[in-house]
């Protein structure tokens, strides 16, 4: 709610258990007055719940100066005063019970000196561990591999973040058999036990937030604030899915006359999680803990570019007490190990985030019933896609510019939600372009580790070459309004 408007409503919402944010505009007088007028217009619109609640009040009461009451004087009506003036709270659903409530993790506020220092210390600590070897985890044990690959810092190709052991097909089969054996026990574990483990995973991630953010920055080149936000998202996945599992475990009644119909959920079996490099921590965590908390044994095969970060997820899960064989960390070549696991007759669920080409192939492979396979595989695929933003003459151009810049250049445009084109109505085109160009010029380009960096490196040489090809196509087909220099590497 806006400061000074709807104080009673805000207090009532808080008393009922809802999270309420009070915000206050600040700055120069004229923009501030313009903002106030806009809010007044919104509050007096026909659809405004404030208007619906207040329109039957006497005009003298509405325009009277506000009176500050003591806390004890403020009363909250439990029912509407009249049938014609319903309470603004009547349209809200009942708040969730405390056991199932969900409060998102807060991002680090780097305006606080303490958190800035904590981040610096974390980077110093993580850099001392660079170059270590990370081996697959199969049936609770780390196993040696014939092949290892270097994961390098996109901001500095000479800096090896870690050496990752890649499994072969034989080791993938060993992992699959270990998962089959563990599933017999894991499926019978109570929902509360599974949820408690996943909640502990979230708590450990919260404790290690600064270090985990540093690993994300160094391995995939994501700027510090965005890396920190990704850790928050991973923590949210753990806590939300744990609460949801406890809710779903109760099942549902769908009764008709003369029948008692009870629906309950059961684990499907073995889940193969194939995670991307552009959200190496949040998406990998989300897909993995969702499968685990619902009682499925899970094999995590991360993208090669972000396999060290996935190893950190492995460490957290092990420290949280995940049983042997229930979770396994199986880095490997996608075309070999990934394909083998997708086509395995004992795979029940495939959770994939990545390109459309690979996702469609997974769908096609999963649809084929293999000899000895007694179930249909389920595929959850989030595939590549870029979003266009449409701006018409009614848009707030200041907000539009901020939104487009954030979407297009956040994580160097490597998110699947990144804006790759903007469609602007002709009447506001010139004004928008002028502001957009100036806003883009203000972006700081540099190494992801630097606090001032807003646009860091792309993930590898292949990605950079592809971007440069599109730049050349743009020069040939359209008018260039801005071109800025960028480092030769990254």
Model-identified regions with their sequence ranges:
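ALDH superfamily catalytic-core signature
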Residues: 321, 343-344, 349, 357-490
């Amino acid at each position: 709610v806006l400061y000074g408007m709807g104080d009673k409503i805000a207090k009532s919402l808080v008393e009922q258990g809802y999270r309420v944010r009070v915000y206050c505009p600040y700055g120069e007088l004229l923009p501030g007055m313009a903002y106030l007028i806009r809010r007044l217009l919104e509050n007096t619109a026909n659809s405004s719940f404030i208007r619906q609640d207040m329109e039957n009040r006497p005009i003298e009461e509405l325009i009277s100066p506000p009176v500050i009451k003591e806390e004890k004087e403020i009363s909250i009506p439990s029912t509407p005063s009249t049938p014609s003036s319903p309470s603004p709270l009547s349209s809200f659903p009942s708040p969730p019970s405390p056991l199932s409530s969900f409060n998102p993790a807060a991002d680090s506020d780097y305006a606080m000196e303490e958190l800035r220092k904590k981040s610096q210390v974390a980077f110093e600590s993580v850099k001392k561990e660079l170059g270590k070897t990370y081996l697959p985890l199969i049936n609770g044990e780390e196993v040696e591999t014939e092949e290892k690959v270097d994961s390098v810092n996109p901001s500095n190709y000479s800096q090896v973040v870690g050496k990752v052991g890649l499994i072969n097909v034989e080791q993938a089969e060993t992992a699959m058999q270990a998962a089959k054996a563990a599933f017999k026990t894991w499926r019978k574990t109570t929902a509360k036990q599974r949820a408690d483990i996943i909640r502990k995973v979230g708590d450990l991630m919260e404790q290690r937030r600064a270090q985990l953010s540093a690993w994300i920055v160094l391995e995939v080149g994501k700027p510090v604030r965005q890396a920190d936000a990704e850790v928050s998202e991973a923590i949210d996945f753990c806590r939300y899915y744990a609460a949801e599992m406890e809710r779903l475990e109760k099942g549902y009644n769908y009764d008709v006359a003369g029948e008692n119909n009870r629906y309950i959920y059961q684990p499907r079996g073995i889940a193969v999680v194939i995670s991307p490099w552009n959200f190496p921590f949040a998406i990998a965590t989300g897909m993995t803990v969702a499968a685990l908390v619902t009682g499925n044994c899970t094999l995590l095969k991360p993208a090669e570019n972000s396999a060290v970060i996935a190893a950190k997820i492995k460490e957290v899960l092990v420290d949280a007490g995940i049983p042997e064989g229930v979770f396994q960390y199986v880095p490997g070549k996608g075309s070999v190990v990934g394909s083998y696991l997708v086509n395995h007759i004992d795979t029940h669920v495939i959770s994939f985030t990545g390109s459309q080409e690979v996702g469609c192939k997974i769908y096609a492979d999963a649809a084929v019933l293999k000899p000895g396979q007694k179930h249909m595989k389920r595929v959850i695929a989030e595939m590549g896609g870029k979003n266009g933003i449409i701006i018409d003459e009614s848009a707030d151009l200041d907000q539009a510019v901020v939104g487009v810049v954030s979407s297009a250049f956040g994580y160097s445009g490597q998110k699947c939600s990144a804006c790759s084109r903007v469609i602007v109505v002709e009447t506001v085109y010139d004004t928008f372009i002028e502001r957009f160009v100036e806003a883009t010029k203000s972006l700081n380009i540099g190494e992801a580790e630097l606090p001032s960096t807003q646009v860091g490196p792309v993930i590898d040489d292949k990605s950079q070459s592809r971007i440069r090809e599109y730049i050349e196509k743009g020069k040939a087909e359209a008018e260039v309004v801005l071109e800025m220099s960028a480092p030769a590497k990254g």
